[in-house]
Amino acid sequence: MSALNDGIKNDASKIWLFDYDLTLYGEEERFVLNSLDHRIAEFVQKTVGGTFESATEIRKDYLHRFGTTLSGLMAMNGTAPDDFFDFIHEPEYLVYPKVSTEKFALLKSLTGHRFVFTNGRGDWSRAGMARMEIAPAIEDVFDLKLMDWEGKPHASAYEKIEKWLVARGVLNKDAKDKSQIVLLEDSLRNLEPAHERGWTTILVNPNVQAPDWVDFHIPHLLNLREKLISNP
């Protein structure tokens, strides 16, 4: 681990970027993501035919090969992104995370700016944050649509959010040191490009071993409290 692993300064220069699924809610609520994955597999089945089981395997294959299932559907099946999301985000088929006053308090305690950086369309994360009652602690959502449907871990996703942050006036466009950008993610694959750009990386995952290039490793979002160093 890097020397940064001793603690992270909680100061006004920070730009906190949170992945949504399995980051803003944790492994203990995986049933939330499972409900979405079920709908995605149903969409794949509707698109390519076959059994639900074979559609599930195609979903996983596209996710692995293309970064997101949607990217695979677009490349291999000509799927229109909004058709995909309109289908999988029908609320009556989905489960959402529970209210968490602890998460809200933690997020509000973070100085600087706070955004969600997600490979989903923004309505999914916004609905989940509303259910958790943490939405007022997040300034905005940078979603897959704003990435022109090419999400993490593609380099373009990170380039686009940096430009978006510059346009919002929270990142200096000439900044050489980008360690003020802090990405919290459950996926090592999605953290690696952030590390290569000089961002501070926080792996939020209880089930994987963090490699040396990861700056911080916590099992759950709430464990971030233990890593924060506030200005005196």
Please place each PLM-identified region on the residue numbering.
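Residue-level marker of alpha-helix boundaries and capping positions
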Residues: 31, 60-61, 116, 180-182
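Asp-based, Mg2+/Mn2+-dependent phosphohydrolase catalytic module
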Residues: 1-14, 115, 121-232
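N-terminal start-of-chain detector that recognizes signal peptides
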Residues: 44-45, 86-89, 113-116, 174, ...
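N-terminal helical cap/lid subdomain that shapes the substrate entry/recognition surface
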Residues: 3-102, 123
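Catalytic-core regions built around general acid/base machinery
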Residues: 102-111
